[in-house]
Amino acid sequence: MGRKKIQITRIMDERNRQVTFTKRKFGLMKKAYELSVLCDCEIALIIFNSTNKLFQYASTDMDKVLLKYTEYNEPHESRTNSDIVEALNKKENKGCESPDPDSSYALTPRTEEKYKKINEEFDNMIKSHKIPAVPPPNFEMPVSIPVSSHNSLVYSNPVSSLGNPNFLPLAHPSLQRNSMSPGVTHRPPSAGNTGGLMGGDLTSGAGTSAGNGYGNPRNSPGLLVSPGNLNKNMQAKSPPPMNLGMNNRKPDLRVLIPPGSKNTMPSVSQRINNSQSAQSLATPVVSVATPTLPGQGMGGYPSAISTTYGTEYSLSSADLSSLSGFNTASALHLGSVTGWQQQHLHNMPPSALSQLGACTSTHLSQSSNLSLPSTQSLNIKSEPVSPPRDRTTTPSRYPQHTRHEAGRSPVDSLSSCSSSYDGSDREDHRNEFHSPIGLTRPSPDERESPSVKRMRLSEGWAT
């Protein structure tokens, strides 16, 4: 820190004035010496103080310098105090550096402009490297759903599987379907039955069991996992999909997994909202869990909920109308059904509702193309027909296929319309066909056998 700058005026205190004179006089002589040596010049300094004392300084000899001075005619430069003051004022007005060392920290216009430029460059860098708020998902989230308790669903998402997101974990062994035994004929799924939604083996090896799972609806929306013998590898970024339908539309299917408790099932209006909100992603929703009406449970059929539900399920035409067509927990939710169409489904009779289901499934099979990664082989095996006695031993495995004795119920009509084939193609392709949904039809004699229907009604669905 430099010395404090003092005002150049006469010092009133005698003592201070004497001290200042002594110091500055020596300083002046020192400067004269430096100037004479550095610049090779002759200097003569004559000082009279306030008490008329003489102080002189000469670089060589005072008499010699004074003689030279008297012989000189006209000085080249002659200055007085007024000239020095004027020169100092001009320097300050030009913005030259002040003797005060603190003035170097002053904010000059040039420095302020420099700081402004630095701030602008920093702001531009922040804007250009801004991180996006919602990065697009690039991986599948595996979900394992044990069914030991019907009050809650435990979703286990292992973090380590994010590095290799190609597996859908298998669910509880109670979800295994007894489709390996000869003779169990796959029935066509009804509005809430997903047992035949993907029956068969979708990989080169024979899978033993699979649980309900869901994949990312954006990357690999084409496959849904159902309780069948399948083992599916869903890849993070699928290769170009293989179109399996009539039109080359974008395959948009995703999985809707219902809550575990039957007391917390979403209402019909919530399901309508879910179906309509799914249209923003253009993804018709296909649920893969067993349906459960509020206050009612299903027994015997493997599902993501519990297999310990009671078997007091009974489905009437009024209950079917309350389902709003396909709006059950595992029904086929069509994203194209709007709110007013859902409202009309409430008021339609069962016969008209069954016709609507048949028309809607035909549209679904032709327009909503299920896409599979082209690296996977489609090999769906059909199984031999079982004797009718096997059907009576497990009546509750196909709960929504019960029929009234007078004729087929609307649920059966809905189940028959869930197939991707219509007309005689269903019967012709019963033994060997390659379908992305893997549906098989029962034989006509089994469908029309009243004894089998009565036994199922008496054993599995007695209230």
Swiss-Prot record:
Cross-link (Glycyl lysine isopeptide (Lys-Gly) (interchain with G-Cter in SUMO)): 381
Domain of life from the UniProt record: Eukaryota
One family name in Pfam for this protein: SRF-TF
Modified residues (Phosphoserine): 59, 98, 104, 220, 226, 238, 386, 409, 435
Residue span, MADS-box domain: 3-57
Post-translational modification Phosphothreonine, affected residues: 283, 290
Basic and acidic residues biased stretches: 423-433
Localization, UniProt: Nucleus; Cytoplasm, Sarcoplasm
UniProt region (Transcription repressor), positions on chain: 358-389
Biased composition (Low complexity): 409-422
Main localization (coarse): nucleus
UniProt feature, compositional bias: Polar residues: 365-380
Posttranslational mods: Phosphorylated on Ser-59; which enhances DNA binding activity. Phosphorylated on Ser-386; which is required for Lys-381 sumoylation and inhibits transcriptional activity. Acetylated by p300 on several sites in diffentiating myocytes. Acetylation on Lys-4 increases DNA binding and transactivation.
Gene Ontology BP, a term: neural crest cell differentiation
Residue ranges flagged as DNA-binding region: 58-86
Keyword Cytoplasm among UniProt keywords: yes
N6-acetyllysine modified-residue sites: 4, 114, 117, 232, 237, 250, 262
InterPro entries given in the database record: HJURP_C (IPR022102), MEF2-like_N (IPR033896), TF_MADSbox (IPR002100), TF_MADSbox_sf (IPR036879)
Presence of the UniProt keyword Transcription regulation in the record: yes
Keywords noted in UniProt: Acetylation, Activator, Cytoplasm, Developmental protein, Differentiation, DNA-binding, Isopeptide bond, Nucleus, Phosphoprotein, Transcription, Transcription regulation, Ubl conjugation
One GO CC term on file: cytoplasm
Site positions (Cleavage): 422-423
Domain remark text: The beta domain is required for enhancement of transcriptional activity.
Job description of the protein: Transcription activator which binds specifically to the MEF2 element present in the regulatory regions of many muscle-specific genes. Controls cardiac morphogenesis and myogenesis, and is also involved in vascular development. Enhances transcriptional activation mediated by SOX18. Plays an essential role in hippocampal-dependent learning and memory by suppressing the number of excitatory synapses and thus regulating basal and evoked synaptic transmission. Crucial for normal neuronal development, distribution, and electrical activity in the neocortex.
Quaternary context: Forms a complex with class II HDACs in undifferentiating cells. On myogenic differentiation, HDACs are released into the cytoplasm allowing MEF2s to interact with other proteins for activation. Interacts with EP300 in differentiating cells; the interaction acetylates MEF2C leading to increased DNA binding and activation. Interacts with HDAC7 and CARM1. Interacts with HDAC4, HDAC7 and HDAC9; the interaction with HDACs represses transcriptional activity. Interacts with LPIN1. Interacts with MYOCD. Interacts with AKAP13.
Designated name of the protein: Myocyte-specific enhancer factor 2C
